[in-house]
A protein has these predicted regions:
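Conserved beta-propeller blade repeats
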Residues: 1-14, 40-61, 69, 86-109, ...
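Short active-site-adjacent helix-start/loop capping segments
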Residues: 20-22, 32-34, 43-46, 63-66
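Short loop/turn segments that connect beta-strands within beta-propeller blades
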Residues: 27-31, 73-77, 121-125, 166-169, ...
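Short helix C-cap/helix-to-loop transition motifs enriched in small/turn-promoting residues
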Residues: 30-34, 53, 63-65, 72-80
């Protein structure tokens, strides 16, 4: 699979090396490609550009499907594991396109059955837990500043609850509960991070795009 760096200056792709898929990078003119990773035990399963220079990729060890997150510079230097923990699985939650050196990830390092969200500093490797998942959170949503502000949980096995907080210093609080026949799905925050655009079918026979106050679930327009 081919991918282009955010500044449009480099192209990356996967190709075999010693029977394993690895990352290669070349200029936009496709001249002089160079190998970035040299994995021999397992394939690079997926990768992405974190910024114009840093590439992130996923790989498991020994086929245990506990995928870990690694990072490497586009020239092949500074390769490091970010979440190499035995028995732990990692997911990328949000690549935070507007923040170069941070991403949000989920890991089950606290509890094997539950994934908690963390902010990962790509320069230092520091991980900061953003919330403790009680076990029923199915989705998280950030604002344009990369702050985790909305969560969705499953209640009673069938109903869904939207939770909200004004800042990451606060606890999430429930805003609205919907049945399996109803839907309120926040899509994106407005530019000022105060309201959200959402898809909902509440009070109507078809889903509609609305402007909503996430603190109250009130439709504004």
């Amino acid at each position: 699979s081919f991918d282009i760096s955010p500044d449009g200056k480099h192209i990356s792709y996967l190709a075999p090396y010693k029977s394993r898929m690895n990352i290669y990078v070349t200029g936009i003119d496709l001249a002089e490609p160079h190998q970035v990773t040299f994995e021999e035990d397992r394939d690079v399963e997926g990768y992405m550009w974190a910024n114009n220079n840093r590439i992130l990729f996923m790989k498991d060890d020994g086929g245990d499907e506990n995928f870990q997150l690694y990072g490497v510079d586009a020239d092949g230097s500074d390769m490091r594991p970010y979440t190499k923990m035995k028995g732990v699985r990692t997911h990328i939650l949000d690549d935070l396109e507007e923040i170069d050196d941070e991403i949000l990830i989920e890991t089950n390092q606290r509890n094997p059955e539950i994934f908690d969200p963390y902010r990962l500093n790509l320069k230092t490797g520091e991980m900061t837990m953003l919330a403790e998942n009680p076990g029923n959170i199915q989705a998280w949503m950030t604002d344009h500043d990369g702050k985790l502000r909305i969560a969705y949980s499953i209640v009673d096995g069938v109903n869904q609850e939207m939770l909200y907080r004004d800042s990451e210093d606060e606890d999430f609080r429930p805003v609205i509960r919907t049945s399996f026949k109803e839907d309120v799905s926040a899509i994106v925050f407005t530019a000022d991070n105060k309201n959200v655009y959402a898809i909902t079918n509440l009070g109507r026979d078809k889903s509609a795009l609305v402007l909503m106050n996430p603190a109250t679930a009130e439709e504004l327009e």
